[in-house]
Amino acid sequence: MTASRAKPDIMARLLDEAAAAANSGEVPVAAAVTNAEGAIIALARNRMRENGIALHHAEILAIEAAMTRLGQDRLDGFDLWVTLEPCTMCAGAIAHARIRRLYFGARDPKAGAVESGVRFFDSAACHHRPDIYGGLSERAAAEQLQAFFAERR
């Protein structure tokens, strides 16, 4: 399966996983690591509140789960899919993991670090830049986040 054919299925799966995060009180963000054929190797959602660890963003957990499952310390040739533009911490993890392609949904002008904010992958401090594809299922992902925060205000 090519990455382009897998996009709707993967993003739909991530939106479901992000909804599960919201149902447990977490910010609705989910991430998946896929192989070159588009098969999901690892799937994760935000678990910061659940685990009591501020570092447990979906991207970090998905990358760690994929590395553990594969017995590798890098993910060359693998892709990361996420419902929200990654923050600086997650962008750093993506670079260190050597992710091949990054696909994300909603843009995050406040805390995002890929196309917004510090634009981590464009900085001299970044030693690996994945191919970046933003805006996948952007409307659905943004609406999910907006609904979550509207309930808490």
Where does each model-flagged region fall?
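A short, polar/acidic, helix/strand-boundary loop motif
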Residues: 4, 48-49
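Zinc-dependent deaminase
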Residues: 1-24, 86-153
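Short beta->alpha transition motifs characteristic of CBS
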Residues: 41-48
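Small-residue (primarily alanine) positions within well-ordered alpha-helices
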Residues: 14, 18-21, 31, 42, ...
